[in-house]
């Protein structure tokens, strides 16, 4: 049986630090991968995951429907819209290239499964710099992005509230209390018959949507407004047996396997 092809786009960054030691100082640069918990959770599963880090996605995310069509599900996680709009040919040389946000919309409309996972450069993101608001990708999502910084920082933590039917395929095999999360992106649920809010923040934290499922054309879309790893999603959540089950269920649903 063929595996479900999944493309994860984003979840990488480079940090630069200056270390001061009395009179002296030196610099260091560190490369980070943020999707390792998900990569590990899918090892040996029915899903074949290709991981396209943010810096590679700028010029390697396909520019054609044919290139995207090899995948059943595409995940956008912690990567801003500019990374897919400002290809070097555009940014450095003033040339035209296909608009990959429109391609992702059309690919989803034709039957693909599109997922956006939260983070500092997801939805609208920190300082509003993720910039997915009013884009073709936002058209596909079951939620609308805010036009400004949308972060919900909750250092005391919160436990998700299940708001949808526990019989939904995304909840299959997940039992008991969910672990604590530390933040999410604030979004607005679209008022459509196909959209279902499956989980939310507790009312004391605003009751904002956490897990939302919907349809776009012949495709399916999912918004998970928290992260897939630290810091918003702590290691206690990663180590929870429901973590791997949740993401396998989400991918199965988005790919229309269930």
Where are these regions (language model features)?
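Short alpha-beta junction capping motif
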Residues: 3-9, 13, 67-126, 215-224
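Short, flexible/disordered intra-domain loops and linkers
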Residues: 17-30, 84-96, 125-131, 236-239
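Extracellular ligand-binding/catalytic regions of CAZymes and related secreted enzymes
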Residues: 1-9, 113, 194-196, 203-208, ...
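An acidic, glycine-rich "communication" segment
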Residues: 1-2, 14-20, 35, 113-205
């Amino acid at each position: 049986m063929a595996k479900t092809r999944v493309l994860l786009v984003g979840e990488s960054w480079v940090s630069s630090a200056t270390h001061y030691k009395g009179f002296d100082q030196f610099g260091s640069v560190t490369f980070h991968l943020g999707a390792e918990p998900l990569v590990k959770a899918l090892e040996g599963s029915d899903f074949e995951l290709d991981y396209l880090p943010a810096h590679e996605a700028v010029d390697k995310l396909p520019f054609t429907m044919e290139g995207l069509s090899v995948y059943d599900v595409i995940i956008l996680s912690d990567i801003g819209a500019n990374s897919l709009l400002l290809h070097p040919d555009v940014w450095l040389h003033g040339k035209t290239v296909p608009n990959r946000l429109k391609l992702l919309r059309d690919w989803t409309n034709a039957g693909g499964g599109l997922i956006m996972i939260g983070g500092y450069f997801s939805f609208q993101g920190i300082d509003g710099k993720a910039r997915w608001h009013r884009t073709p990708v936002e058209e596909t999502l079951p939620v609308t992005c805010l036009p400004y910084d949308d972060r919900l920082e909750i250092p005391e933590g919160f436990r998700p509230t299940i708001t949808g039917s526990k019989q939904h395929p995304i909840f299959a095999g997940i039992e008991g209390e969910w672990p604590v999360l530390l933040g999410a992106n604030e979004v607005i649920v679209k008022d459509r018959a196909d959209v279902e809010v499956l989980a939310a923040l507790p009312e004391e934290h605003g009751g904002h949507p956490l897990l939302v499922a919907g349809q776009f054309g012949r495709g399916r879309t999912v918004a998970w407004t928290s992260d897939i790893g630290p810091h918003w999603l702590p290691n206690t959540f990663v180590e929870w047996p429901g973590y791997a089950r949740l993401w396998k269920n989400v991918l199965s649903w988005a790919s229309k396997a269930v």
